């Protein structure tokens, strides 16, 4: 896909995405997906055929890519075909794969404690504490600004996150203490001209932008390796662990739903499948077989009236 050929088409697609108020992350993903499709068919997407769509979907399947990523790529291609190019005949042939319902991978409280203890710097401890202590996504952590922190009420405001929704999350005393330490040590050479409330808590190297989620993921994996956690967890496991540990401690699932920003309670309810503390507290019916069966007490009948 040459820049000259793509430029007008890409501009039109961006305009269509802006008109529908798609967030920046979604737009980047859609553009990347369409570039991948164009590179595969070796031509501009506006000349694609039904056979091109079929071959591309087969190609993605043959690469061993996860169903989630295949769906994500084809969603971007579908947007281009259906919205920008008005090729409904082609977009209708893009199928959505049903994703297997996997149990979220979580860390135990001991593993989480070890992870935070071995974080190599104040910045790393704070970043990971925000992920676990507030149940934040990676993108939510790195995009925090001064204005989002309410130290008086111990609340962090998350603005326009997934699904373009705002929500409030808890701010623990330990995390607030780390935030205050970090603010004193945080590099400020790039803050000139930026109002205090708009300053990034974790600025990137170039200035003007926050640190990247890739940098945050690297810090997480370094800490996980140092803590001896070998079960393949990712940074998102901190969010899973936040929800699971709250559930095990008896927090109402509807409050957890609000803290995570889930639209549907069913999405939050999946953590009941990994709350090992709750599962272990339930007595198996097999163990009860050997116990003497309790007979129901007979109610004393009132004597008949004289």
Model-derived features with residue positions:
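Conserved catalytic core of the tyrosine transesterase superfamily
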Residues: 1-306
């Amino acid at each position: 896909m040459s820049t000259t050929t793509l430029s007008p088409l890409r501009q039109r697609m961006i305009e269509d995405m802006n008109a529908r108020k798609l967030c920046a992350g979604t737009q980047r993903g859609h553009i990347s997906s369409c570039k991948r499709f164009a590179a595969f068919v070796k031509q501009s997407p506006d000349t694609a055929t039904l056979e091109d769509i079929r071959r591309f979907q087969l190609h993605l399947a043959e690469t061993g890519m996860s169903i989630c990523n295949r769906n994500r790529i084809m969603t971007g291609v579908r947007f281009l075909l259906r919205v920008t190019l008005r090729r409904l005949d082609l977009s209708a042939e893009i199928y959505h794969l049903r994703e297997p319902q996997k149990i979220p991978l979580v860390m135990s409280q001991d593993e989480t404690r070890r992870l935070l203890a071995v974080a190599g710097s104040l910045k790393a401890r704070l970043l990971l504490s925000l992920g676990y202590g507030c149940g934040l996504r990676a993108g939510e952590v790195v995009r925090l600004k001064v204005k989002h922190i309410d130290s008086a009420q111990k609340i962090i405001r998350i603005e326009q996150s997934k699904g373009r929704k705002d929500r409030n999350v808890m701010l623990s005393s330990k995390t607030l203490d780390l935030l205050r330490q970090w603010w004193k040590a945080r590099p400020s050479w790039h803050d000139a001209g930026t109002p205090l409330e708009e300053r990034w808590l974790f600025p990137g190297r170039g200035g003007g932008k926050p640190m990247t989620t890739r940098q945050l993921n690297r810090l997480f994996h370094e800490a996980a390796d140092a803590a001896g956690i070998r079960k393949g967890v990712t940074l998102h496991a901190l969010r899973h662990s936040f929800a699971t540990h709250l559930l095990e401690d008896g927090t109402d699932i509807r409050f957890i739903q609000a803290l995570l920003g889930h639209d549907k309670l069913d999405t939050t309810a999946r953590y009941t499948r990994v709350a090992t503390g709750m599962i272990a507290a339930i007595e198996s019916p097999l163990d009860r077989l050997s116990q003497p069966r309790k007979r129901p007490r007979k109610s004393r009948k009132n004597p008949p009236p004289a």
